[in-house]
Amino acid sequence: MNTLQGPVSFKDVAVDFTQEEWRQLDPDEKIAYGDVMLENYSHLVSVGYDYHQAKHHHGVEVKEVEQGEEPWIMEGEFPCQHSPEPAKAIKPIDRKSVHQICSGPVVLSLSTAVKELVENSLDAGATNIDLKLKDYGVDLIEVSDNGCGVEEENFEGLISFSSETSHM
């Protein structure tokens, strides 16, 4: 059994590819890579990992992954190994915060927010979805649907989560 060697950092949960390795991946594998990297990134940021350090990893900007750009590194090149700044520790968080994080995704962009809201409606069985944006989603993102909604026992956690993330 492995024991914890120190604080977990973004480089511990990231996957790197050389240009040649990246070329050998099929399109679905590249999409899965981007999804996993963005999810890892959002989880780390949500538990207090330094946003500015997390957004740049091994020469790859998180925005490049979001935009579907190729995140490969040059063979033998591992810039973060020579970084003057040590990795930030991820601190434990309380149960309430864990519940709030598990209640929904950390929103990295407007398109991610809209996608998650629509997916939530579809997961709830919606067959009709109305989407309203005010000022291109800066002031308001509202999704109305005819789905089953949220079960009563989960409602309280969603209220506190929504109020904390309503100012994207």
Curated annotation (Swiss-Prot):
GO function term, MF aspect, one: ATP-dependent DNA damage sensor activity
Domain KRAB: 8-84
BP term (GO), one: mismatch repair
Disulfide bonds: none
Database matches in SMART domains: KRAB
Cited InterPro entries: HATPase_C_sf, KRAB, KRAB_dom_sf, MutL/Mlh/Pms-like
Record's GO cellular component terms: mismatch repair complex
Pfam family, one: KRAB
Assigned protein family: Belongs to the DNA mismatch repair MutL/HexB family.
Other facts: Encoded by one of the numerous copies of postmeiotic segregation increased 2-like genes scattered in the q11-q22 region of the chromosome 7.
Protein name, as recorded: Putative postmeiotic segregation increased 2-like protein 3
Organism: Homo sapiens (Human)
